Amino acid sequence: MLLRFAYNKGDYPEYDEMVKNLSNLVDVLPFAEKQADEYCEAYARAHRDDKIQYLIGSGNLWGPTYSYAMCIMEEMQWMRTKSVTAGDFFHGTGEVIGRDDRVSLFYGEDAPRPQMARAEKFLHTICKNLTVFDTAKYELPGIDKKFRGLFSPIGLGGITGRIGVYLEEYGKHPMPIRR
């Protein structure tokens, strides 16, 4: 909706092209989820019962990272998490992560990729349990490269949706059960 306002003011000439790409997501997202499914299952199986999980996301993936950690992993699966942006990671969280802690990085296709890469590079020196979820890894036929960054949160939603299904299965904890 905001992009439409920008278009109406003459500030977003790519609006019609973006809407066309957005309409292609309906067919493309199941394809992306299928590509990620095996990786998501392996992650959930291996890490369902980890003591704590740190999740790092930035840019337009910060909101989905934060909400996935809090709403799905904590509230619906009773898992301990800490979510942080790549920029804030170096202001505290990076000091408390141990060698055996689980850290997941959620890479999008927008401007903060270099920050994410910097956090990942540092993490390789202090932690042996990193998992990278990168929306750029998945083919999205019908989506122009210039819009992939804009649509990264939707792609991550498909990936985390698959993780959630497997966390529920391996934890034997149905999502609707809360305290």
List each language-model region with its residue ranges.
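A SIS-like phosphosugar-recognition module
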Residues: 1-179
